[in-house]
Amino acid sequence: MAATTLKDSFPLLTLLGIAFLASVCLSSRSDQDNPFVFESNRFQTLFENENGHIRLLQKFDQHSKLLENLQNYRLLEYKSKPHTIFLPQQTDADFILVVLSGKAILTVLLPNDRNSFSLERGDTIKLPAGTIGYLVNRDDEEDLRVLDLVIPVNRPGEPQSFLLSGNQNQPSILSGFSKNILEASFNTDYKEIEKVLLEEHGKEKYHRRGLKDRRQRGQEENVIVKISRKQIEELNKNAKSSSKKSTSSESEPFNLRSREPIYSNKFGKFFEITPKRNPQLQDLNIFVNYVEINEGSLLLPHYNSRAIVIVTVNEGKGDFELVGQRNENQQGLREEYDEEKEQGEEEIRKQVQNYKAKLSPGDVLVIPAGYPVAIKASSNLNLVGFGINAENNQRYFLAGEEDNVISQIHKPVKELAFPGSAQEVDTLLENQKQSHFANAQPRERERGSQEIKDHLYSILGSF
């Protein structure tokens, strides 16, 4: 078979060029029908009382079939008031816990020991499935806000929690055992066990209520309760702070913001911890990142080669644009390409889809692998992301002075792939002097705004 020439490769190169130049897309979708955006009201309240709440985001694959690869991942949001404690429990799921705001004491129980950690904003730790722990808001004024990525080990997407201490609405895990087993296990009469460890008749009352009634009664459940300052001081005595070392331990928390950012300039900062840099993340194959985009700035268009990134808006507002395929049915795409093969570029371009969304605190975004994305901040924007399939992931930027993959294309290929000449493409790419983050306003618009301001100043100066 004869070797393929550059001219023979023209349709493929054209496709690559169109994928790079996301601005050519002919259609867009707003927040309402955007399969990659979950507004904050998509969180379901599992528990709420005067001391705080626990909320779980709806299943990713229930929101869209495009997210079926995330069926075993859930997002959990926890919030509590000052001087409160989230009582001991264990869950059949691995957790990656990130402190969004506030100060906490996390105690993790081991068979023959316990570890307590003093946590602050940006601190992150993995809690293996089955770990029993309790979380205290040790601050005097600020609410504690925690985000958890949850990976169940029994039923995909269905984490189950078991309380160590019970109440009338949710009994202790111990109450599920028979009297004989409990008496033999503790070598104590059942009445004493019931008095000391179990909620009296809690199991019977619990099963008499339906799910709806239990949710209504959730206001009375003692899952998040008050704790005294003296008790907090006792718990905080031997608490360790997060690791500031370049390499983290297998069990201690690490702070996302204490390391050097991988990208940084006056427009924003991008912090990231990968499995290579942290052993806690290796078996889960997940990276965690923390992004700060300053008001009026832009995280430049880029995509991840392998990772699917789940992003939560912690603070601020902005705009999100994601480029994908208009028709996600690949069989349908092939049929259209066969029918319109001679039209080439024009027919392919119609498949490029722009997904847009306005971002507010609590919103969640999903960025599939290979889908270019850009995020603009209308106010100081803070994002927390979990990257699934982190191993061997590569981030490719499509604009900017550094790490711009388009600039690596050979000049003869640029001549074939883009409407402009190779020189024109290079000149265009060189217009952007920033890397990774940049001013969100185009240069011409910025210049025009400055001219208007100067004109207004000259008019006002005449008075």
Curated annotation (Swiss-Prot):
Residues in the signal sequence: 1-27
Annotated region (Disordered), positions in chain: 235-257
Localisation per UniProt entry: Vacuole, Aleurone grain; Vacuole
Matching Gene3D superfamilies: Jelly Rolls
Keyword field: Seed storage protein, Signal, Storage protein, Vacuole
Ranges of compositional bias, category Low complexity: 238-252
GO MF terms held by the record: nutrient reservoir activity
Keyword ATP-binding applies: no
GO cellular component, as recorded: aleurone grain; vacuole
One Pfam short name: Cupin_1
Domain called Cupin type-1: residue spans: 35-194, 254-426
InterPro entries per the UniProt record, alphabetical: Cupin_1, RmlC-like_jellyroll, RmlC_Cupin_sf, Seed_Storage-Functional
Family (UniProt): Belongs to the 7S seed storage protein family.
Protein role: Seed storage protein.
PANTHER family: OS03G0336100 PROTEIN-RELATED, VICILIN C72
UniProt protein name: Vicilin
Organism this protein belongs to: Vicia faba
Lineage, uppermost ranks: Eukaryota, Viridiplantae, Streptophyta, Embryophyta, Tracheophyta
